[in-house]
UniProtKB/Swiss-Prot annotation:
Belongs to the serine/threonine dehydratase family. One of its GO terms (molecular function) is identical protein binding. The keyword Acetylation applies. The lineage of its organism: Eukaryota, Metazoa, Chordata, Craniata, Vertebrata. The keyword Secreted does not apply. This is Serine dehydratase-like. One of its GO terms (biological process) is lipid metabolic process. Pfam families: PALP (PF00291). Keywords: Acetylation, Isomerase, Lipid metabolism, Lyase, Pyridoxal phosphate. It catalyses: L-serine = pyruvate + NH4(+); L-threonine = 2-oxobutanoate + NH4(+); L-glutamate = D-glutamate. The gene is Sdsl. Its cofactor is pyridoxal 5'-phosphate. The modification N6-(pyridoxal phosphate)lysine is found at K48.
Length: 329
């Protein structure tokens, strides 16, 4: 390994320690302290840089000469940023409906961008084909132990900030990488008793479907507007997570997720994408209250942490269009 590359590979992780702040507005809605883990302020715009950055650094150590990543947006941006930092070429394969702003961001990071297929799963087939080339390595957006290991850093930060465990952690599930990473982190710090509320939108609810079936299942199509959650088949590891920790799977409608995005913008002055709105809907749509009423969550939660996962796949114009499309007030 050349000296300059060795220095970049051996450097600090590419992710930053993100703020954990109590939200007065969401705490008022929930009736309990709500802490927001602001992963949307990561330099690559989402939590994905934790796991993907770690993966790419490890692959560079092993002599990777070209990275390729299929993505709905966030994973690709994390891979492109990591590749630029490492000085390694990268190809990002996106579904054809990906927004222009995401494509421009990727090209700005120096990535080659290819548009293939209607949904992420189809783009992923192309990425896997490209990864068969000599020296190329496929960067899974969510399904690799190194990815989960990187995401686990988020929980170590939670422990350092909070000291004591929260009553629950709320997160969005797409392919399941964040869920797998948070599970790994909870086990690592001894917080395995902390429930995870795993939120999805209907039409991208591959984890909920897998839990009901007891095995990974493939959705016929991704019909949700939360395209960042658009994996038709969730990682098999997520089913193991549900056995290792208490995982409560909940599904909300697109309208609830988009309404949560608007309310969060008004409350916290931050624009996040519908995938993140799915997690926020646990508060805004009263999911936590219902889980408490059903006895599935403690009626006396000391606090709740909501992971604000990212905001790359949204603009003010897109938000207005989604509100009109879904009939949001």
């Amino acid at each position: 390994m050349e000296g300059a590359l060795a220095e970049r590979v051996g450097a600090e992780p590419f992710h930053r320690v993100t703020p954990l702040l109590e939200s007065w507005a969401l705490s008022q809605v929930a009736g309990m302290p709500v802490f927001l883990k602001y992963e949307n302020v990561q330099i690559a715009g989402s939590f994905k840089i934790r796991g993907i950055g770690h993966f790419c650094q490890q692959m560079a150590k092993r002599g990777c000469r070209h990275l390729v990543c299929s993505s709905g947006g966030n994973a690709g941006i994390a891979a492109a940023y990591s590749a630029r930092k490492l000085g390694i070429p990268v190809t990002i394969v996106l579904p054809e409906g990906t927004s222009v702003q995401v494509v421009r961001r990727l090209e700005g990071e120096g990535a080659e961008v290819q548009l293939t297929g209607k949904v992420w799963d189809e783009a992923n087939v192309k990425a896997q084909e490209l990864a068969t080339r000599d020296g190329w390595v496929n960067v899974s957006p969510f399904d690799h132990p190194l990815i989960w290991e990187g995401h686990a850093s988020l929980v170590r930060e939670l422990k350092e900030s909070l000291g004591t465990p929260p009553g629950a952690v709320v997160l969005a599930v797409g392919g399941g990488g964040l869920l797998a990473g948070v599970t790994a982190g909870l086990l690592e710090v001894g917080w395995q008793h902390v429930p995870i509320v795993a939120m999805e939108t209907r039409g991208a609810h591959s984890f909920n479907s897998a839990l009901q079936a007891g095995r990974p299942v493939t959705l016929p199509d991704i019909t949700s507007v939360a395209k960042s959650l658009g994996a038709k088949t969730v990682a098999a590891r997520t089913l193991e997570c549900a056995k290792e920790c208490e995982v409560l799977s909940e599904v909300v409608e697109d309208r609830e997720a988009v309404s949560a995005v608007q309310r969060f913008l008004d409350d916290e002055r931050m624009l996040v994408e519908p995938a993140c709105g799915a997690a926020l809907a646990a508060i805004y749509s009263g999911i936590l209250w219902r889980l408490q009423a059903e006895g599935r969550l403690s009626s006396a939660l000391a606090s709740v942490v909501v992971i604000v996962c990212g905001g790359n796949n949204i603009s003010s114009q897109q938000l207005q269009e989604l509100k009109i499309q879904l009939g949001c007030s």
